[in-house]
Curated annotation (Swiss-Prot):
Recorded metabolic or biological pathway in which this protein acts: Amino-acid biosynthesis; L-histidine biosynthesis; L-histidine from 5-phospho-alpha-D-ribose 1-diphosphate: step 1/9
Keyword line: Amino-acid biosynthesis, Cytoplasm, Histidine biosynthesis
Source taxon at top rank: Bacteria
Regions annotated as coiled coil: none
Main location: cytoplasm
GO cellular component: cytoplasm
This protein's name: ATP phosphoribosyltransferase regulatory subunit
One Gene Ontology MF term: histidine-tRNA ligase activity
GO biological process, one term: L-histidine biosynthetic process
Subunit structure: Heteromultimer composed of HisG and HisZ subunits.
Length: 373
């Protein structure tokens, strides 16, 4: 390793090699669209954007999961396959530098998702235990799949399920969405003609009306969102406002989000919740229970692992388990990861490839090492 790498880098790469991963390097300059489309609002606003001579929008690499997946697709490598990386990422941050090191593993193509999920948590825990010897670690797990299964079982329409799923991982967004669900805002800001078209769900008529208004105002329909996109969003918002959840269903959703228990009792807590609310969580609960058993089989300290039903991570591509690991009593995560079974298909893979992975923040780890007595 050159001197620009953190002192712990060599030990991390040895661990990666011992865990049967393929070391991969990806370009610092990346096409921006995959990140803008799939990475989530929190990361999107932190990206450093630029433009190529041909007009393509590019960005400095803000994370590794998407570039590693793109590299896998272009290489046409077989699966299952485990990739490891260690390098710099670039994000606008309120604290710390805008350029910092991350390391991690992306585990692609293993159809035994419970075992792959457990292995990812165990890999992250082993890495942190290696570089922070003697430090007590706390693991927090959430599950996007369980959350979406609860929303479906409650009978929420697709638009609301999508909005709440996008908000999962951001406490302010989730609270705002729940507030709107409890008390839908009135649609009083639209003019009479637009309001009528929205109420009728007339996508073509509304698109034509918006296009005419943009033309009169001298606005280019190609400069931003198209008239059809704007019309579709207005109609979707109106449909969301028309839904009011029953008091019983809303109480059930709030009760679900309040579940926060040790992992060894989490499946039982979810079963109790579902039975009390009269809901069937089906395959999502079966997957959850299988994963919990697989994690325990890795010998991780069960008393340090907790399931938080309201816990998510602010990246749009997660579909299942999500997790973070922090020093016991610490406020900032040292590692974070999760499952992203739709991501590779969205990036262009010809067949569905399941994936799960994690990354660690080396600057945060270094700060803890330096502060140790």
């Amino acid at each position: 390793m050159t001197s620009r790498f953190p002192a712990i880098a060599a030990n991390i790469t040895k661990l990666f090699a011992a865990r049967n991963t393929h070391a991969v390097e990806v370009a610092i300059l990346q096409p921006a669209d995959p990140f803008l489309d799939m990475a989530g609002e929190d990361l999107r606003r932190r990206i450093f954007l630029t433009e190529s001579e041909t007009g393509q929008t590019l960005c400095l690499r803000p994370e590794f999961t998407i570039p590693v997946c793109l590299d896998h697709i272009s290489s046409q490598a077989g699966t299952p396959r485990r990739y490891s990386y260690l390098g710099e990422v670039f994000r606008q941050r309120r604290e710390g530098g805008n350029e910092f090191f991350q390391a991690g593993i992306e585990d692609l193509g293993d159809r035994d998702t419970a075992q792959a999920d457990a292995r990812s948590v165990a890999d992250a825990h082993a890495l942190l235990s290696l570089v922070l010897p003697g430090r007590s670690l706390a693991v927090t797990l959430g599950d996007q799949g369980i959350f979406e299964a609860v929303l479906a079982a409650l009978g929420l329409p697709r638009g609301w399920r999508m909005r709440l799923a996008r908000a999962f991982g951001s406490a302010p967004m989730l609270q705002a969405a729940l507030a709107d669900l409890a008390n839908p805002p009135r649609n009083g800001q639209l003019s009479g003609e637009v309001a009528a078209l929205v109420l009728d769900g007339d996508l073509d008529g509304l698109s034509t009306h918006i296009a005419g208004g943009m033309e009169q105002a001298g606005l280019s329909a190609s400069a931003g969102r198209s008239p059809t996109d704007i019309a579709r969003r207005l109609i979707e918002k109106a449909e969301l406002r028309s839904v009011r959840l029953s008091n019983e269903a809303f109480a059930a959703l709030k009760n679900f989000l309040a579940i926060h228990v040790p992992l060894d009792g989490a499946a039982r807590a979810l079963e109790t919740f579902a039975a009390g609310a009269g809901l069937s969580l089906g395959a999502a609960l079966e997957k959850f229970a299988a994963r919990a058993k697989a994690i325990e089989a890795h010998g991780l300290p069960a008393e340090k692992i907790r399931y938080d039903a309201a816990f998510g991570r602010p990246l749009d591509y997660y579909t299942g388990v999500v997790f973070e690991i922090a020093a016991q009593g610490g406020e900032r995560p040292l590692a974070g990861g999760g499952r992203y079974d739709r991501l590779l298909t969205l990036l262009g893979a010809k067949t569905a490839i399941p994936g799960v992975g994690f990354s660690v923040w080396l600057d945060r780890i270094e700060a803890l090492r330096e502060a140790a007595p």
